[in-house]
Swiss-Prot record:
Species classification: Eukaryota, Fungi, Dikarya, Basidiomycota, Agaricomycotina
Signal peptide: 1-19
Binding site for Cu cation 1: H82, H420
Cofactor: Cu cation
Amino-acid positions noted as binding Cu cation 2 in the UniProt annotation, renumbered to this chain: H84, H127, H472
Protein name (Swiss-Prot/TrEMBL): Laccase-1
Function: Lignin degradation and detoxification of lignin-derived products.
Length: 520
């Protein structure tokens, strides 16, 4: 264990933890990696995939100098990073989406992200939010420990060894894949699936699978993160039950299951009791999304890792998967019912219906309009005085919502789209493919899939800012499947919730606009 991580975990065991500012230096570089045995150029943090693991405690602030050292002319050289799941109260400019919250950061510059995790804790992640850049490798885990976790009695071990990332991997570079997608209308198909940055593809070398080490009798909190651009994963461990306890940074009532579906950008914590005979067991995360007929390299069942008991031989498992109970939305109930969502079966203050269509494939429309990024970030336009949709350019997919209001969003079913709301969690009061509203104790998340049935969620506008709502299949976002909420515009400019705007954030747009297109 690295010393810095050990100090974080020791602090997490002390009830009187003092909030600290923790600094993580990020060098963003192009390097050649072969996570599945096929070597290719990448865009990665500190030369590794997944990127550097961030571990902090509840109440901490983070300071992350991002040194953009990208040089490859075959991939995007500017960048922005989204810190997925954090509310960013008063720091909407640090949220990361290009042209919503900031201009991209040019190459050969340093920009420092600074924000507080405040009262949030749980499992988060970070990734590029410029075009489809994170599909080239810029993605990593971000964990916030709670020294007073009300479910702490359920597990013994919760450290860097129990963080599990699920990803797909492409042998083609993201800009080339995007161009092919736009010209053919066919979404790119991944070559392999990775667990903790390791995997295999059909006909490729037998690269070692990742190993999660356990000791018999201990209970492990596995923090499982889908850092994928497209597919979802069905996570299970052979011969072991799992106790679900967290979704997207929100702790829920414990539920015993055998497997969990985890969509792009979703996170779950599950407790694994190492109570089986000392041996090796397959950790499985087969992918849904991506047709092997379109890419012979792909074997969706090769998304594997090894659970290895202390004392077991260092060999691959021979265990067999036995299907069992899958976690259901109807079983997910937050342990706390206070904000940011406001529950109740009364009418919302504002109702919004988002109708998805694809009349001009591969591009998507919402209510007849495809999202196109503005040239000036939405947040900057709000801070410059925009108070109505007609004040923003382009204005078509900007939804202005007043402060302290209950917003209800209804999305009629149209394909499998994991929608992510920035700046908030939301309460899923009508789950996809369900016909019963739950206003008492619905799941609370920041990513939820629209799976062919009407989905309705509610959130409360207590956090002024510019907040993206978009499909987290990155190819779909690039094809226009998004809107932006401009929340409480006047409160962004002045008052106790006004935005903090550091000088280096204000400098981003002039710096970006001054560089040649090839460096953008």
């Amino acid at each position: 264990m690295r010393l810095s991580n050990a100090l974080v975990l020791v602090a997490a065991c002390i009830s009187s933890v003092v909030a600290k500012t923790r600094t993580f230096d990020f060098d963003l570089v192009n390097t050649r990696l072969a996570p599945d045995g096929f070597e290719r150029d990448t865009v990665v943090i500190n030369g590794e995939f997944p990127g550097t693991l961030i571990q902090v405690n509840k109440g901490d602030s983070v300071r992350i100098p991002l040194h953009n050292k990208l040089t490859s002319p075959t991939m995007r050289r500017s960048v922005s990073i989204h810190w997925h799941g954090f509310f960013q109260a008063r720091t909407s400019g640090q949220d990361g989406p290009s042209f919503v919250n900031q201009c991209p950061q040019p190459p050969n510059t340093t920009f420092t992200y600074e924000f507080s995790v405040a009262e949030q804790s749980g499992t988060f992640w970070y990734h590029s939010h410029l075009s489809t850049q994170y599909c080239d490798g810029l993605r990593g885990a971000f964990i916030v420990y709670d020294p007073r976790d009300p479910l702490r009695h359920l597990y013994d071990v919760d450290d860097e060894s129990t963080v599990i990332t699920l990803a797909e991997w492409y042998h083609i570079l993201a800009p080339d894949a995007t161009n092919e997608f736009f010209s053919s209308g066919i979404i790119p198909v991944q070559d392999s699936g990775l667990i903790n940055g390791k995997g295999r593809f059909n006909g490729g070398p037998l690269t070692p699978f990742a190993v999660v080490n356990v000791r018999r009798g201990k209970r492990y909190r596995l923090r499982v993160i889908a850092i994928s651009c497209r597919p979802f994963f069905t996570f299970s461990v052979d011969n072991h039950s799992l106790v679900f306890m967290e979704a997207d940074g929100v702790e829920h009532d414990p539920v015993e299951v055998q497997n969990v579906d985890i969509y792009a950008a979703q996170r779950v914590s599950v407790i694994l009791h190492a109570n089986q005979p000392i041996d090796n067991y397959w950790i499985r995360a087969p992918m849904t999304g991506g047709n092997p007929d379109r890419n012979p390299n792909l074997n969706i069942s090769l998304t594997l890792a090894i659970l290895r008991y202390h004392g077991a031989r260092h060999v691959e498992p021979t265990t067999v998967n036995v299907p069992g109970h899958k976690l259901l939305d109807q079983e997910m109930h937050p342990i706390r019912q206070e904000g940011p969502g406001k529950l109740g079966d009364g009418p919302p203050d504002k109702h919004i219906t988002l109708n998805i269509a694809q009349p001009n494939a591969p591009f998507f429309d919402i209510n007849g309009i495809s999202y196109i990024s503005p040239t000036v970030p939405v947040l900057l336009q709000i801070l410059s005085g925009a108070k109505r949709p007609e004040d923003v350019l382009p204005s078509e997919q900007i939804f202005f919502v007043p402060k302290n209001s209950l917003i209800e969003v209804n999305i009629p079913g149209e394909g499998a789209h994991p929608f992510h709301l920035h700046g908030h969690n939301f309460d899923v009061v009508l789950a996809s493919n369900d016909d019963t509203f739950n206003f008492k104790n619905p799941p609370r998340r920041d990513v939820y899939p629209i799976n062919g049935g009407n989905t309705t969620f509610r959130f409360f506008t207590d956090n002024p800012g510019a907040w993206f709502l978009h499909c987290h299949i990155d190819w779909h976002l690039e094809a226009g499947l998004a809107i932006v909420f401009a929340e409480a515009p006047e409160d962004n400019v002045s008052g106790p919730q006004s935005q903090i705007t550091p000088q280096d954030w204000l400098d981003l747009c002039p710096e970006y606009n001054a560089i040649e297109p090839e460096f953008q």
